[in-house]
């Protein structure tokens, strides 16, 4: 039997990291078993579902590279199918119409609460004969009485629920709209889902859904309920812990590989290995290896992984993601070095692509003024001669190569009988406007000969004005 999994988000908000981890685990379960992965949009909550949220979910999945084999399916486009099954269940007696008013249901719950009883429907309409009436009604599933529902969860082991603790679930509201728990069952059945991976908040839905599947004569999928993600303070992860939307991590400068690697380790492990490529995840992933204890989100670990991938992935690939940040920061990369070369030069220093973009601006744009602190420290009178001499030597170069630039800087220090720092620091401030950059030879090479000479001239003029003031 082909393994078939699904990710079924509700489009009432953005794709958050908890949902992304669930999607990843479900995707990996399919890929690890040469199966299929289905994307389903559970939009039956019509009032809260939005197209913007749906678009954001698809954008997040695409950015992460979690491609789907079927879908996206939309529940709101399957109402005819749900109504067909409801009519069939009413005919077979596995569902019934309930005419109880809201007032009666509220009074029942109040009485049960006052008596310390579990709040559940009492089956008032369960065995009533059919009515020919225009009274509003809901449709309820006729849950089995007695016995229990038992299933083996890949994460939590054997779980058992007493049927007597379950009431007769509403499967269609008074307006005819089918409910979440019912739609999920029909979808999983129709789509041939063999394994359901979802959050632990769905555990209580599982016995209800299993009973409906049994009533329909449908196969029961396997289940894996993963634990929640906590903040580093032990509380449930929320906006106050930082970014929770997947695309916010994109905006903050994280690579999808880093986020995927981090998310897979929030509950799953393979020995003490920390770094996993997507291919390695597909080869090694097993649902049974997921820890049932909650995982704490640690931004420092995510940053570490991001640095690792910025440094180790193909610079051309990193540059393709960096371009978004260059555009976002309005840095025109058409007039300057290849972005992949900048990635190679700056990768060791960058924690995020957002930082990398900001620190690469001087390769593409001239700066209006020097950093005040660095200029005060390094563009002083003693810097005039080193700047003038190194400018002459750089101007005389017939080939603008990293090696030739390095030799020109060294020759300047040798000729002036000073340490490299006496030449290098004023030169660095001159061409970058600041005090930090990669090696000066590669920095000058990437900036280009003409632009480097112009900036050195500007620095010489700055120092001269300072001497004369």
Curated annotation (Swiss-Prot):
Names of the cofactor(s): Zn(2+)
Main location per the UniProt record: cytoplasm
GO biological process per UniProt: glutamyl-tRNA aminoacylation
Catalytic function, reaction form: tRNA(Glu) + L-glutamate + ATP = L-glutamyl-tRNA(Glu) + AMP + diphosphate
CDD domains membership: GluRS_core
GO molecular function annotations of the record: ATP binding; glutamate-tRNA ligase activity; tRNA binding; zinc ion binding
Cofactor binding, note field: Binds 1 zinc ion per subunit.
Compartments, as annotated in UniProt: Cytoplasm
UniProt motif 'HIGH' region: location: 9-19
Any one of the GO CC terms: cytosol
Residue ranges of the motif 'KMSKS' region: 236-240
Function of the protein: Catalyzes the attachment of glutamate to tRNA(Glu) in a two-step reaction: glutamate is first activated by ATP to form Glu-AMP and then transferred to the acceptor end of tRNA(Glu).
Protein's name in the database: Glutamate--tRNA ligase
Organism: Shewanella sp. (strain ANA-3)
Higher taxonomy: Bacteria, Pseudomonadati, Pseudomonadota, Gammaproteobacteria, Alteromonadales
């Amino acid at each position: 039997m082909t393994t078939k999994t699904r990710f079924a988000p509700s489009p009432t908000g953005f794709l958050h990291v908890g949902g992304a981890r669930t999607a990843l685990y479900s995707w990996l379960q399919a890929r690890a078993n040469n199966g299929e992965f289905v994307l389903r949009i559970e939009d039956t909550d019509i009032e809260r579902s939005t197209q913007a949220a749906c678009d954001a979910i698809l954008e997040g999945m695409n950015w992460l590279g979690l491609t789907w084999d079927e879908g996206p399916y939309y529940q709101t486009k399957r109402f005819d199918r749900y109504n067909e099954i409801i009519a069939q269940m009413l005919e077979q007696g596995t569902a019934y119409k309930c005419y109880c008013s809201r007032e009666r249901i509220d009074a029942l719950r109040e009485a049960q609460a006052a008596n310390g009883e579990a709040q559940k429907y009492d089956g008032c309409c369960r065995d009533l004969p059919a009515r020919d009436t225009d009274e509003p009604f809901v449709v309820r599933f006729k849950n089995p009485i007695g016995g229990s529902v038992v299933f083996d969860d890949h994460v939590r082991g054997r779980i058992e629920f007493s049927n007597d603790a379950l009431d007769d679930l509403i499967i269609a509201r008074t307006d005819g709209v089918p409910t979440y728990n019912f739609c999920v069952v029909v979808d999983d059945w129709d789509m041939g889902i063999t394994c359901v991976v979802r959050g632990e908040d769905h555990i209580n839905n599982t016995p209800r859904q299993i009973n409906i599947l049994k009533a329909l004569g449908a196969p029961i999928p396997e289940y894996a309920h993963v634990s929640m993600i906590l903040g580093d303070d032990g509380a449930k992860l929320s906006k106050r812990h930082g970014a929770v939307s997947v695309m916010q991590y994109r905006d903050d400068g994280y690579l999808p590989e880093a986020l995927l690697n981090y998310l897979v380790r929030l509950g799953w492990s393979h020995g003490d290995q920390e770094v996993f490529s997507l291919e390695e995840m597909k080869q090694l992933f097993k649902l049974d290896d997921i820890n049932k204890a909650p995982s704490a989100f640690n931004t420092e670990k995510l940053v570490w992984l991001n640095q690792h991938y910025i440094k180790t992935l193909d610079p051309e690939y990193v540059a393709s993601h960096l371009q978004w940040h260059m555009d976002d920061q309005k840095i025109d990369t058409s007039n300057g070095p290849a972005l992949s070369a900048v990635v190679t030069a700056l990768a060791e220093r960058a924690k995020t692509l957002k930082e990398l973009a900001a620190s690469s601006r001087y390769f593409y744009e001239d700066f209006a003024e020097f950093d005040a602190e660095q200029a005060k420290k390094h563009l002083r009178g003693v810097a005039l001669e080193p700047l003038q001499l190194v400018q002459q030597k750089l101007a005389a170069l017939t080939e603008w190569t990293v090696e030739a630039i390095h030799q020109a800087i060294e020759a300047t220090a040798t000729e002036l009988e000073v340490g490299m720092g006496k030449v290098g620091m004023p030169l660095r401030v001159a061409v970058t406007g600041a005090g930090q950059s990669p090696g000066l030879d590669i920095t000058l090479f990437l900036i280009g000969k003409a632009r480097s000479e112009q900036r050195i001239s500007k620095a010489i003029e700055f120092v001269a004005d300072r001497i004369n003031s």
